[in-house]
Amino acid sequence: MKFTTEARADLARLDLQLARRVFNKLHRLVENFEFLVPEPLTGDWKGVYKLRIGDYRALYTFDKMQLLVHFIRHRREVYKIK
């Protein structure tokens, strides 16, 4: 799992408890990826997937070997980025 510069900054802005929750959920996604169905986005976000973490969303892409987290933002903000 890798994080973009934006995702690292997003994670750093969260309070410690929420940041741990986000990181743990992303880690579980990576560990159990073959058993989960990713939630794809549409429109301008085609090719990007979301992970719901309470009121927050992690937007990521993946290939066979790696998951790349692009953003971690509140649900009211995350889709307005592009």
Model region roles, listed by residue range:
Residues 27-51:
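A short, surface-exposed loop/turn module that caps and links secondary-structure elements
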Residues 24, 35, 65-66:
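N-terminal processing/targeting junctions
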